Amino acid sequence: MHRLKDKRALITGGTSGIGLETARQFLGEGARVMITGQNPATAEAARKELGNDVQIVHSDASDPAAQKALAESVRQAFGGLDVLFANAGIADLRPVEGWDAAGFDRTFAINVKGPFFLIQALLPLLANPASIVLNASVNAHIGMANTSVYGASKAALLSLVRTLSGELIGRGIRVNAVSPGPISTPLYGKLGLSEADLKAVAASIQGQVPAGRFGNPSEIAKAVVFLASDESAFTVGSELLIDGGMSL
């Protein structure tokens, strides 16, 4: 199938996990794809996996100035944009008393401020019609311990889905979100835990999923393809919860 034939797409955080798998599926659906990342090693691995048809840009997801530079890269490469998947994010999990202002600000800078100012910078380039997909989380809905700041940042994204939908639909720009449950991605390996603690955390989380397992990046990417394509042309301001029943 070529549901995204000739669509120009930007995926932030596209060098690993959900972003990388989404880039793979976008390419398979006929899109022209640019991805961002910060780690040179994962960027090189992504290039080897995806081939030379994908463009990879080093970009800091937390910096508003970097979002303007990224928009300029999109303009130079594509001339405009049909699809944005704002996927870059971090999951910093701590108890309430473990937070300081710097950590709090970093989470919101990457998970909320970055996507907001990227959308702002891309507005002159977004086509009519265009699709924006934000990567939120089931943690915006459930009261899991140690996720207060992470969950709040993802809840902020869901608020943006609704408010930006109301503001941008007149320009033909649809805004929607995917909210994954626990997914087998490198994100969990970035929590700074020992191997034993990481396994314990994973087992605890898996026990809270009615489906009895972690999801796969491909299961999220398929939903993003749908929201990016014309198949979802009447889907505006919506959230797709893909969580194995965790939010029941």
What are these regions (language model features)?
Residues 40, 58-69, 101, 219:
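The beta1-alpha1 cofactor-binding region of Rossmann-like NAD(H)/NADP(H)-dependent oxidoreductases
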Residues 125, 213-242, 247:
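C-terminal substrate-recognition "lid" of short-chain dehydrogenase/reductases
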Residues 124, 166-170, 233:
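Alpha-helical segment proximal to the catalytic Tyr-Lys
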Residues 95-96, 100-108, 205:
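Substrate-binding pocket helix/loop in short-chain dehydrogenase/reductase
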Residues 119, 153, 161:
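Active-site helix of classical SDR
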Residues 137:
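Residue(s) in the substrate-gating loop at a strand-loop-helix junction
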Residues 8, 15-16, 39:
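Conserved glycine-rich cofactor-binding loop
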